[in-house]
């Protein structure tokens, strides 16, 4: 898996240490520190994915500092200041590039989020704290390849995908589609797949349902073809793993009694 790393350094310094107290509560530390960030972008895809040159260009990334779900600061990577003063407390650092969509054929979304607790320094010398964020694609790559012989028996055929991110909607791969799609998935998510066909001979329709486990940065290629005539006419499925790409190829043969 190819990787592209980038970083911008982060220093946590100490400002004035302040304390507040009451008769009912212990003193809570407060103060102001200077932070910087260390971000790692792991944009390599475990499949024959789209051109990743855009995702390796650091100037395309956005960096945010978040506290209690509120975005305090947003920077383009090229405009990121060398240091940032913040109050002591809990924060999130988020870096991302692309549009966060449930499915896309044009792009993929890359994101990293890290929680950090900022504490003020009590010494004369500034303490150094590094906040590391790793950005990765949140999607899996899927492709469907229909055999040329499908058109000899079926007037229409397509594959429907259902994921958690899609909600009540679905993504349909038509018989004329060729470009891969990038589906937003959770780790080890069970993705529902339905193969639908319409016979030329009598216009009857048939469907078969499958489930495949997918995770971000993985690939799935589904090859659909008519099955050679046999006595049972059952659907058979074979799984082949290409270790050079980690693409999972699912060969789905249409049963004899569908033709």
Named regions from a protein language model:
Residues 1-19:
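Sec-dependent bacterial lipoprotein signal peptides
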Residues 11, 81-82:
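Alpha-helical interaction segments
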Residues 21-76, 83-259:
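Extracytoplasmic cysteine-anchoring/structural motifs
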């Amino acid at each position: 898996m190819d990787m592209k790393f980038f970083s911008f350094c982060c220093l946590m310094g100490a400002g004035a240490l302040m304390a507040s107290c009451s008769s009912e509560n212990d003193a809570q530390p407060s103060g102001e520190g200077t932070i910087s960030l260390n971000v790692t972008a792991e944009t390599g895809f475990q499949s024959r994915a789209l051109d990743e040159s855009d995702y390796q260009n650091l100037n395309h990334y956005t960096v945010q500092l978040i506290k209690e779900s509120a975005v305090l600061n947003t920077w383009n990577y090229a405009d990121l200041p060398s240091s940032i003063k913040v109050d002591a407390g809990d924060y999130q650092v988020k870096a991302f590039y692309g549009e966060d969509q449930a499915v896309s054929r044009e792009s993929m979304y890359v994101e990293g989020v890290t929680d950090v607790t900022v504490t003020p320094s009590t010494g004369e010398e500034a303490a150094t704290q590094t906040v590391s964020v790793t950005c990765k694609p949140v999607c899996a790559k899927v492709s469907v390849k229909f055999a040329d012989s499908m058109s000899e028996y079926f007037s229409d055929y397509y594959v429907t995908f259902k994921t958690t991110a899609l909600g009540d909607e679905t993504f349909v791969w038509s018989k004329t589609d060729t470009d891969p799609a990038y589906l937003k998935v959770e780790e080890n998510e069970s993705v529902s797949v339905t193969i639908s066909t319409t016979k030329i001979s009598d216009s009857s329709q048939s469907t078969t349902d499958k489930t495949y486990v997918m995770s971000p940065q993985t690939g799935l290629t589904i090859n659909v073809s008519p099955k050679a005539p046999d006595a049972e006419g059952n659907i058979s499925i074979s799984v082949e793993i290409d270790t050079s790409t980690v693409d999972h190829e699912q060969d789905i043969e249409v049963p004899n009694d569908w033709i």
